[in-house]
């Protein structure tokens, strides 16, 4: 299963929808072997059909979507709306080797959308960049999912994060609580992303923040003198890696801890996720947070 969730494997698959399908097929086939039964966890749990299983337990919708036979072992209590928010500011173009943050965000967003669709949830997409917000209202059908994949593939990060708009009106939706999943590198100049989260928090939705970072960003594993460019402002700085690495890591650790506390204070689920990490844990986080939205 883990191989199908490996970013290097996903990057070799050119079609985003196929990548998402392979990822979720691998993830679902391993659910029964895992230990994700945390307290209060409730979701549609599946295992592969075995000869002798009661045919009445076959999930035909699952078969139609994945072309595989699965036995449904427990029921989802309710369907919800899942809104996937993608940061498409220029800093998401940051790369570690050939793999960028936005590429990882695409695969993560597509896999979460595919999994939510299998759960029977309505899925929406919101892409944030300087020129404004592209939005797809949540719907539950496969044509809508195909359009969502297309829009994810079309994302071209540029500029700074979206200027303040009427976020509350955009995300108010129905009276039911929803699940908002924000994939971002949290690069901001004036707390604009935190302000967005504060606004969304007033709607009393469940919010997940996946903070995308790269390994070279965490380790500063460059050699000698290097020139770094701010992808959003164009400003540059030259530093000696050997002299700066220790101080950099100390400041980075402090920043990540401060960010974690900010999210905790707002009761927002927060996880840092590196672009070389498999998607499995993020998918588990989604299922756990989704289980909280019971009507």
Give, region by region, the residue ranges found by the protein language model:
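N-terminal low-complexity, intrinsically disordered segments
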Residues: 58-66
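Acidic, metal-associated active-site segment
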Residues: 45
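Exposed, interaction-prone extracellular/peripheral surfaces
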Residues: 1-29, 35, 48-53, 62, ...
